[in-house]
Amino acid sequence: MIKQKKLSVLFVCLGNICRSPTAHAVFRKCVSDNGLSDIINIDSAGTGDWHIGRPPDRRSSEKAKEFGYDLSDLRARLVETSDFENFSYILVMDSKNLDDVRKLAPKDHKAKIELLLNYSARSRVDNIYEVPDPYFGGEDGFDHVLNLIEDATLGFLDYLKANYISELE
């Protein structure tokens, strides 16, 4: 019998080619390293339709690879109405994404929609609450984004482990 995944997480940014696929890959590795891949389903999506079907931005993929994360199997897609029923958590990168996702959400949805950096200890210290879009910037922006995402996804996994995982195993 195949064990059904009991928690699901969708990471969302604007185009689904930089921030959300990075979060997807980083969190997927954290989940795998903790032996929780059979419990947690992970995906990513965007609120804009410019890049549907395309792989992540080369700079995101290269930066992620430097740190041991693999984005090669990911392809951009749009947030869909069904995501609000299929995902327990929808974690967005910035306040514009948060507004856009909330506007798309059906009134009776069950998903918890919030900023990814709500789970980052570092962001509270540095007063950073959004993952900035590195698309139009230089290489340093991709480093910064990866560091923010690593901290927040580890914090989110700690939150899940403390509040849900023991009940689901």
Which residue stretches match the model-derived regions?
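Conserved active-site segments centered on acidic
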Residues: M1-N86, Y159-E169
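Hydrophobic structural packing positions in well-ordered secondary structure
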Residues: C13, A64, L91-V92, I149
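Helix N-cap/beta->alpha junction signal
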Residues: S20, D94-S95
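Phosphate-binding/catalytic loops
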Residues: Y89, S95-E169
